[in-house]
């Protein structure tokens, strides 16, 4: 509450609060403490519910945009309504707590109960952020970290169980190339499109890909916008979320982007790098050589 914030600022001007700082807070008796406790529990519950909607939560179950509707747009509309309702209720609760404690401590002339939107504990829906998190969840399904058939984490080490992935099979060799063209059938873009089709249906695939591409803010055909996001921005966004402990590892040939691939750290095997070299790097080099020869033949024929 505002009261606690003001008192803690006096007791400890830094941003760190110790148990001894909390112990120093003056506590005045209030006749209806259960009312305050219920409000506080309600606030905590809503905050946790919002936090659990993101994959960094230990209690994450599934992405909020995966539901019974057939378009990502409708799923986002439902999610936005849920977020707006939760935001409004939590803001009202926090303002009520402020009002009660301001009255208890007799601080009506110093503080007001109103809470600015930016200070409310939970967040509102954000189209680009939430679509990017949907893409991140899809990548998790590609690697088997998540499954469309299992709540929460499907695999984070231990014994691999292929039976957890009947609806959308996880990548077999834990190597997914990120390509600027359709060099491999199971590249990141191709697998993502298949994932969207599996989740939302083939009838709405084009509509969903366009909605996702528009949310990413790119220009051009939806497939190419999504491909460019995987090429240029996905891994940077992943590292922002997981900071210095990314769960997907990027193998990159250098600045020219000749070859890139992701693996899932928990599925790393002693032969992963060797397999990547023989099954993917050599294959892509061969495709590049073929493309170069084709261009040289065209130039020769035109001269």
Q: How does the language model describe each region?
A:
Residues 7-19, 68-76, 115-117:
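Active-site-adjacent bridging/hinge elements
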Residues 22, 26, 37-44, 48, ...:
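Short, well-ordered alpha-helical packing segments
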């Amino acid at each position: 509450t505002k009261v606690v914030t003001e008192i803690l600022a006096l007791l400890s001007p830094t941003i760190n609060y110790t148990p001894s700082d909390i112990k120093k807070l003056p506590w005045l008796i209030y006749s209806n403490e259960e009312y305050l406790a219920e409000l506080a529990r309600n606030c905590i519950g809503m905050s946790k519910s919002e936090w659990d909607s993101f994959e960094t939560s230990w209690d994450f179950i599934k992405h909020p945009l995966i539901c019974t509707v057939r378009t990502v747009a409708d799923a986002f509309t439902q999610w936005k309504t849920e977020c707006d309702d939760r935001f409004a209720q939590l803001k009202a609760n926090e303002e009520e707590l402020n009002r009660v404690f301001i009255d208890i401590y007799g601080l009506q002339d110093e503080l007001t109960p109103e809470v600015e939107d930016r200070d409310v504990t939970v967040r509102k829906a954000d189209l680009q952020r939430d679509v990017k998190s949907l893409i991140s969840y899809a990548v998790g399904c590609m690697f088997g970290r998540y499954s469309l058939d299992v709540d929460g984490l499907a695999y984070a080490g231990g014994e691999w169980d292929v039976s957890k992935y009947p609806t959308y099979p996880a990548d077999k060799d834990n190597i997914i190339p990120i390509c600027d063209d359709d060099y491999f059938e199971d590249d990141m873009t191709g697998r993502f499109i298949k994932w969207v089709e599996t989740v939302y249906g083939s009838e709405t695939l084009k509509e969903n890909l366009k909605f996702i591409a528009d949310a990413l803010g790119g220009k051009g055909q939806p497939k190419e916008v999504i491909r460019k996001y995987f090429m240029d921005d996905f891994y940077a966004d992943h590292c922002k979320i997981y900071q210095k402990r990314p769960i997907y590892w990027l193998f990159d040939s250098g600045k020219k982007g000749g070859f890139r691939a992701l693996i899932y750290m928990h599925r790393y095997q002693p032969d992963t790098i060797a397999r990547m070299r023989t099954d993917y790097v050599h294959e892509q080099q061969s495709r590049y050589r073929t493309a170069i020869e084709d261009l040289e033949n065209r130039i020769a024929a035109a001269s």
